[in-house]
Amino acid sequence: MRNFKFKRSLTLVAASSLLSLTVVSIPTAAQANPVCTTANFVTTCVGATTDTAPYSMMVPANFNGTVYLYSHGYRPNVPVPAGIPGYGGYTVTNTPQPGPNATVIGALLAKGYGVVGSGFARQGWNADSAIKTNVELVGIFKKQFTKTTKVVTWGESLGGFITQALAEKHPDLFSAAAPLCMASDITPLMTMAGDALWGIKTFFDPTIKGGNYSAGAAGYAEAMGDLVKVFTVIGSLQAAFAANPSTPAWPATSKVPDAIKAIPSRSALVLVALMAGIPMQSAHFDSTSAPPGLPASNALSFQLAINPAFAALENVANAAALAVLATHDLELQAGGAVFDNTATDYSARVADEQFAWSSALSGVSGTQGLLSVLAASPRAKANPAAVEKMKALASHSGKVEIPTILFTGVADPVTTAGNQQSVVDKYATYWAEKWATAKKAGERKRPANNQLVLWNLTPEKYTKYTAAGAPDTSVPAATGTNHCNFTTSQYMAIADLLAYAADNGKNMSGGALLTKLRKAGNMTYDRGYSAPKMKYYGN
């Protein structure tokens, strides 16, 4: 098998997906009234809600009465020291963000729409407080701009979670909602993150603490140390994969038995991805293609065994890094360890996938060998009181009475497509219950379907190769991959769909919808498509 070299180092998306757009200066305390300035026919107002969360409002001179309330994604609640890949140099910020990016904000203002967004009073997992902040912010906006007639809400990642919760809990405030690349309920999400982090610890570096962090400064140091160790493992695997993709060596920090080390380390990483429910397509690896010019047997081996391992490498790196930060954050809030896999059967977790990915897992014997390590390794045990406290945090019922538009990439490695699918399934159950109740009451008209589900699919093949035949990770991430990896055209299509829903009381449908999606590019409406469930919900 030919040896391959990456054109450049592994691309990480986590930091860029989490850090937010800087739009305005940040108020330091709650202000009774917004402070406004007008320039270039746009009035910009800043202030802070009663919880001290800073906000920004922008309204054009030709304001048409509709405002877009945007909720930003997860921002770490602690600073990250410089030098740590992906997040290094991050400082905690509550800068308000009234839209996905400056281009989208400008386009909405040009169309006569207002935009508003909060920086929130607390960073990290802040859904409960953010919901209250946004409700107050809507009232402030309406008081300041009395011509407001409709409010639509949208957001990404954790902001998508917040958006869905607003639609469920406050349908009286909003005309339509669009949760994008949404996070799911926290327990399923932390199960995925915990499985990924525990898998890396178990196979590659048992000194990773992986949770149950100490209180105070000691716990912060442990979490930052884990980040360093995770990226050290990823760097070691990356070098090994590039040097010998067929049988890459194990990291020096691994303590698995020598007999297990006879199995390629790439197979262990693939197993980590599968057992956590992390996608097997990544920003640059489609899990199906091979470099041009390889002999047929080598090409088949690359397609079935090597490409999937590179995909797992990119995706697990992003999932595990966020897992460290989110675990530390949630443990601080809940008062103890929240991840528990004492009863998890990882063999059952991959019962279906192990055959589809047999070559990547080094066959039946390789799979069984790796699973034996998981079965014999010490498990993580949660603090019951902390788990109950975490369960009390905001969650989704799936019950919405206003038009709602869902959109996510099918190979998002952070908020996997299963996050969106869980809300789709909950709404389907709710709608069926409503229809059954209506029929029992003698009604013949079906309830309105208030949920429009859209998917950002990946191309069939998209891995690029250099002239030397090496995988090229310098090209942009493929559509449908990475975290919240959307184009301006896609954002504007969602914005247009929200405006239509707000004006008409229902989602766009039929030919008009399909034309809108086609023009935006890489947006799919397919009622027959169902994303894999998150592992928390079973296979």
Model-flagged regions — what are they?
Residues 1, 31-32:
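Initiator methionine at the very start of the polypeptide chain
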Residues 1-2, 21, 402:
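A general, composition-driven signal for non-globular sequence regions
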Residues 33-153, 161-539:
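C-terminal His-loop and adjacent cap/lid subdomain of alpha/beta-hydrolase
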Residues 19-29:
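C-terminal segment of classical bacterial N-terminal signal peptides
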Residues 7, 30-31:
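Targeting/processing segments of secretory and organellar proteins
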Residues 2-14:
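Bacterial N-terminal signal peptides that target proteins for export
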Residues 12, 16-19, 393, 408:
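Preference for short coil/turn "hinge" residues that link or interrupt alpha-helices
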